[in-house]
Amino acid sequence: LKGHPQAITPNIKKLSDSGTSFMKAYTNNPICGPSRSSFLSGIYPHNSLNFWQKPWYNNDVLANTKTIVEKFKENGYYVVGSGKILHHNKKELWSEFEHNSDLGPVAYKGKKEKGKIGISHPDIPKPFRTERMVGCCNMNGGQIDGSFGPLKNVENTKLDGEQLSWAYGGSRGYKEFKYTSEDERDLTPDEINAQWAEDKINELARSDNDSPFFLAVGFVRPHTPLIAPQKYFDMYPLEKIELANILENDMDDTFLNYVETNNVEKSEVGENNSTLTHKQPVSYTHLTLPTMIRV
């Protein structure tokens, strides 16, 4: 797909140059949960009717379907994994599973309390901090979809009179994520998984077990929250970013435009319908995905 001309991605380029890139690869669903369960089970969402973020193993069709992990395991593979692979994980599928998916680090306000979650990045203006839940998911603002900004020292920063800090995500119970500077900070969840994968590969190489293995590592980014070390933001000064070309009148035939210009009552399409509230883009650019395979 070539990517953005200003994107600095040496590792992806190295993988692409040494593997095969598929120019017409399409996601099975434009949100992560049903897309992952479809990809790893081989069952299309329109056959399973699993379109939303409910646990895939509670779906009648998928509950009676074996994932690729189970298939490998049944055929003598040692299957190990870590990170965000299936949106809702079942550890019993694996021979060994290390870290559950963690979307952190996230901003945290005040003292840690049971049931208390993170907040939007402190640089996000207050009007855009409001959370709006649709089913199980927040589709507007908040710690996940309402966060964009750099990791920075917030030791002396308060918001609404409360001290700010950084925290790992919910799977780690919002454990403190220590950050003083880029040279003095905890590892991000993706970095933890990368280190684990490297160690696991070396461990398997030294093992006397001759069985083949299947290893899956699920890196979170570029999934929201869009929080990363400052050095990555410094690579792209806002005043130098080239904006994408947009065709004239390109937005005139969208679903939301139809609703607004034709005065369609929201009740007709469902006030709480995920199609309307999430405004999940279903277009060519959102259904295509970069797919590279290296053997």
PLM regions with names:
Residues L1-L287:
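Formylglycine-dependent sulfatase
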Residues H286-V295:
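Single conserved hydrophobic/aromatic residue that forms the stacking wall/gate
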